[in-house]
C-alpha cells in the first residue's frame, strides 16, 4: 500500500478537511490522506486489484480484497503479519509469505541459520518489489501524489483508471514485441 496525500487545508467554505481522509504515521512523519492497496501478479507485474481506504487503515485488513482467488502463493511486507489468522482469510487457498520484522532478524545470533534466513528474506523482497513498480508509475510518471477530489469513492475510481493505464505502461514492451501486434 502507498499513501496518497490529501490537502490538509481548512481554508474552504465549511472550514473543514475531507472527513473521509485520515492521518497516519509512516516512519517518523505524519501524513493526511488515503491509502491505495494493490494486488499485483508476480510474473507479469500487472495490477489485478485496487482498494482505496483512509490512510489509517492497516494493510492486513485489506488483504482479502487484494486476492483474485487463483493464487497459490501471496507475498506481503511486514504490514501483513498475522494475515493467515484473520477470519476473512479462512478458506482462501493462498499460502502467505510475509516478511519478518527487521528487529527479529537483528535479535538472532550470527551464524548459518541467520545467514540462511537473510537470504530467504532477500528472495521474498525481490518478488515483493514487483508491487512497487505500479506505484512508481502512478506517483512519478503520472504525478499523482495528491488526491484530486473529496471523498474516497471518487479518488478510488480515479485510482482504478490510473492503475489501468499503469498496466499499459508496464506491459508496453511485451505488447510491442509480440508478433500479433504488427499489422499485416
Q: Where are the regions a protein language model picked out?
A:
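Short alpha-helical "patches" and their helix-cap loops
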Residues: 150-156, 173-184
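Polybasic low-complexity intrinsically disordered regions
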Residues: 1-95, 101, 160-166, 174, ...
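Generic structural signal for hydrophobic core residues of well-folded globular domains
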Residues: 138-141, 168, 172
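Acidic, contiguous segments within the catalytic cores of piggyBac-derived transposases
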Residues: 118-119, 124-126, 162, 169, ...
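Helix-centered, glycine/charged polyanion-binding patches within enzymatic domains
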Residues: 72-73, 78-153, 157
Amino acid at each position: 500500500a502507498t499513501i496518497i496525500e490529501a490537502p490538509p487545508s481548512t481554508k474552504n467554505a465549511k472550514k473543514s478537511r475531507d472527513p473521509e481522509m485520515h492521518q497516519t504515521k509512516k516512519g517518523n512523519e505524519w501524513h493526511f490522506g488515503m491509502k491505495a492497496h494493490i494486488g499485483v501478479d508476480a510474473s507479469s507485474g500487472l495490477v489485478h486489484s485496487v482498494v482505496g481506504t483512509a490512510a489509517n487503515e492497516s494493510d492486513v485488513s485489506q488483504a482479502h480484497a487484494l486476492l483474485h482467488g487463483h493464487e497459490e502463493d501471496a507475498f506481503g511486507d511486514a504490514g501483513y503479519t498475522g494475515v493467515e489468522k484473520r477470519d476473512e482469510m479462512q478458506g482462501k487457498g493462498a499460502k502467505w509469505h510475509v516478511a519478518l520484522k527487521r528487529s527479529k532478524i537483528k535479535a538472532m545470533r550470527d551464524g548459518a541459520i541467520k545467514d540462511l534466513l537473510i537470504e530467504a528474506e532477500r528472495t521474498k523482497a525481490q518478488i515483493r518489489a514487483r508491487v512497487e513498480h505500479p506505484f512508481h508509475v502512478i506517483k512519478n510518471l503520472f504525478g499523482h501524489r495528491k488526491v484530486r477530489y473529496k471523498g474516497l469513492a471518487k479518488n478510488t475510481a480515479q485510482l482504478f483508471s490510473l492503475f489501468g493505464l499503469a498496466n499499459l505502461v508496464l506491459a508496453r514492451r511485451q505488447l510491442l514485441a509480440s508478433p500479433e501486434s504488427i499489422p499485416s
